[in-house]
């Protein structure tokens, strides 16, 4: 028996899916999409398990998060310690309740544009070598191929002021945040040209009012001549 991608689609009243016990199952990632009331899956199969609204799949070598119930109302997802991959990107993005995501020691995070718009913070286990989190904002780890580079600024992070970490590389990508009003840029931080342009034009932070940039930063002149809000050189 196969659960194909989007086998259940836009079933707005669907609340529970029950799979036959001990059946020969193949449940593909995101088998139910647009099912925003689905909060429970019943399954008794050695290759699958449910934990905290997430269906995990065992491929005989490792466990992966295969489906995130779109109607599961918990505001925090702690990725199971045994999970090595997140395959449920579409169903996760469709969940409007999750505010916090905590990555375990070794799992990779979906790209920022694939994360829920309701997300306010991302945290990581202390021994995770891929990433570090600064005030709920996710960066690549210092010993990776993209050291200290921004991975994701959560779309619904409620902070009105954010200070980029020292020596960080700030690259927003396509994620937008409407809450930020003041951005602080230390001179040791690098802001990608494209990101700086979008910041100054109000594309990524549409309600940004003030940029505080440290004296000695290579971005001072561009910010002064481009940003129409308040510029403070400190």
Spans of model-derived segments:
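Periodic small-residue-enriched repeat registers in elongated scaffold domains
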Residues: 5-8, 31-32, 91-92, 174, ...
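Extracellular disulfide-stabilized recognition modules
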Residues: 55-67, 138-139
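Short, solvent-exposed loop/turn segments that connect beta-strands within catalytic domains
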Residues: 60-64, 143-148, 203-204
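Short internal loop-to-helix segment that lines adenine-nucleotide cofactor pockets
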Residues: 87-88, 172
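Alpha-helical elements of the RecA-like P-loop NTPase motor core of helicases
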Residues: 111, 194, 221
